[in-house]
Each structure stands twice: as structure tokens, then as C-alpha cells.
Regions:
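Membrane interface segments of multi-pass transport proteins and intramembrane proteases
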Residues: 69-71, 112, 145-154, 200-208
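N-terminal, membrane-interfacial amphipathic/helix-forming hydrophobic leader that caps
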Residues: 1-126, 132, 143-144, 257-274
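Glutamate identity and glutamate-enriched acidic tracts
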Residues: 10-13, 99, 152, 167, ...
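Membrane-interface interhelical connector segments
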Residues: 145-171
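Transmembrane helix-loop-helix hairpins at the membrane interface
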Residues: 132-139, 162-274
Length: 274
């Protein structure tokens, strides 16, 4: 009897433990995803590709509707530009949402979707201080330095778009512009440039290196080129704010505030557009 128990226990000890492929895949999927530079560039590619495809599709649709290809009408390039960024931005944010769904809650802080690590009142104070400083520098560059070299009245692409829509009197166009300037645009750009790119670079580089590289990419995505120094200043300030607070919400807040400021300036007709 004792021999039987002994042999059964030995056989149970020697029995191999089978690990199914399902167990391995579950163990692998339970590991949190770590944001990479490759993912950051993919996010930027999705953003620009979405805008390009929407712009092309809308352009061909307008040509088909109005017969502009036969000379019977004209294509409004400013409206195409606004539509492409607006709907392309919505597609980009949808892609970001699928990323969050795919990688789970651990992915949120990696792209800065969390509360600020400093107190709310300090965060708000930083937003307004940086807003004031950057816009003073931007005004100095555009209204003082550029005229010294014979470049007066240079305005940015968004301001050109607003001026055109205002001239046409399109209510739908103005509504679309406001949604783009105050919601979709700031959220999309901050999620992609600060949330994905800067966060990814910061894993491989010192924080300031990540800010500078991201700011160069941000600057290159705006026009005209004469205003690149302004966009670089904005991006460095917003990148520093993101680095300091660890919260994308603060970067989005100052971006919205900046766009709101220029929208008010445009509505009032003040000559400090950028």
C-alpha cells in the first residue's frame, strides 16, 4: 500500500506542467504598453495623412458638384483647408481613442492624460504667465522685428482662413472655424505633439531635447515660414508646461487660450494677427 502511494506521488511530481498558448498570450497582453518614438511618428503621420485624404476627397467632391474642372466654378481653397483639418482632426482623435482602448488605463499617463502634479492654482498661474510672455515675444517678432526687414503685415494660416471666411459671410464656415480653432485643433495638436511625440522622445532623450525636437516638428507644420520663430516659441513654452505639470490638460488649456485670443483679435480687427 505504501509502495502504491509512493509511486503515485512520484508520477505526479514527474508529470509535466502544460502551458497553453492562451496562457502565454494572456501573460504577454497583461504587460503594460510602453510608448515608443515609432508610435509617436505614426501618430503624426495619421494626423497629416487624415487631413490630406479629407482635403483631396472634399476637393474632388466640390469639383463634381460645381463642375469646377470644366471652368464652370471655382474651388475655395480656404474652405477646403479648414474642412480637411477639422475632419482630419476628428479622424486623428478617433485613432487616439482606439489606441487608448487597445492599451488600457496604463497608457493614459504615458501621453499625459492625467491630473497636474502641481496644485491647480499654480498650474493656472503658469498658464497665464506663459500665455502673456509668449504673446509678447510673438508680437515683438511680428510687429517690431519683421517690419525692420521689410516684412510687414504677415499673418498666419489660421488668421488668413478666418479673414477669408469672414469676407464670404458663411455662417457654416465660421462655425466650423470656431470648432476647429477652439476645440479640435488644440486638442489634436497637443495630443499628437506633446502627448505622443514629446513623451516618446523624453524616454530616449533629456527633457529639453524632447521639447526642442518636438517644437521643430510643430513649427514645420505651420505657415508661413516667416512666422516659424513664433510657432517655435509657442511650442517650447507649451512643451515646458507639459513637462512641468505632467498633464496634457494644461498644454491644451494654454493652446485653446492662445487661439481664443487670436480669434478675439480677428473679430475686433486689431492689427496684431498671427
Amino acid at each position: 500500500m505504501a509502495d502504491t502511494n509512493s509511486s503515485s506521488s512520484e508520477s505526479s511530481e514527474k508529470a509535466p506542467v502544460k502551458i497553453s498558448n492562451l496562457d502565454v498570450s494572456q501573460a504577454t497582453s497583461s504587460q503594460p504598453y510602453h510608448l515608443t518614438v515609432k508610435r509617436g511618428f505614426l501618430a503624426m503621420f495619421i494626423m497629416y495623412a487624415s487631413q490630406t485624404l479629407v482635403g483631396l476627397g472634399f476637393s474632388y467632391w466640390l469639383r463634381f458638384i460645381h463642375g469646377a474642372g470644366d471652368g464652370a466654378g471655382t474651388i475655395d481653397s480656404q474652405m477646403i483647408g479648414m474642412t480637411s483639418v477639422l475632419f482630419g482632426g476628428a479622424i486623428t482623435l478617433l485613432w487616439v481613442w482606439t489606441d487608448i482602448r487597445r492599451y488600457g488605463p496604463s497608457f493614459l499617463p504615458q501621453i499625459g492624460l492625467q491630473q497636474s502634479v502641481i496644485k491647480t492654482n499654480q498650474s493656472v498661474m503658469l498658464v497665464f504667465l506663459l500665455f502673456s510672455a509668449t504673446h509678447f515675444l510673438a508680437w515683438t517678432y511680428r510687429s517690431v522685428i519683421l517690419p525692420l526687414v521689410g516684412q510687414e503685415g504677415i499673418i498666419g494660416g489660421a488668421s488668413q482662413m478666418f479673414a477669408h471666411i469672414r469676407e464670404t459671410g458663411s455662417v457654416l464656415g465660421m462655425a466650423g472655424f470656431l470648432v476647429l480653432a477652439l476645440i479640435v485643433g488644440p486638442v489634436m495638436e497637443e495630443v499628437i505633439f506633446r502627448g505622443y511625440l514629446q513623451s516618446a522622445f523624453a524616454r530616449r532623450l533629456p527633457n529639453w531635447g524632447a521639447i526642442l525636437i518636438t517644437s521643430l516638428l510643430f513649427m514645420a507644420g505651420h505657415g508661413p515660414m516667416l512666422l516659424w520663430p513664433m510657432y517655435f516659441i509657442y511650442s517650447v513654452a507649451w512643451g515646458w508646461l507639459f513637462m512641468h505639470t505632467k498633464s496634457l490638460k494644461m498644454a491644451i488649456a494654454i493652446h485653446i487660450l492662445s487661439n481664443l485670443f487670436y480669434t478675439v483679435v480677428a473679430v475686433m480687427g486689431w492689427g496684431i494677427l498671427a
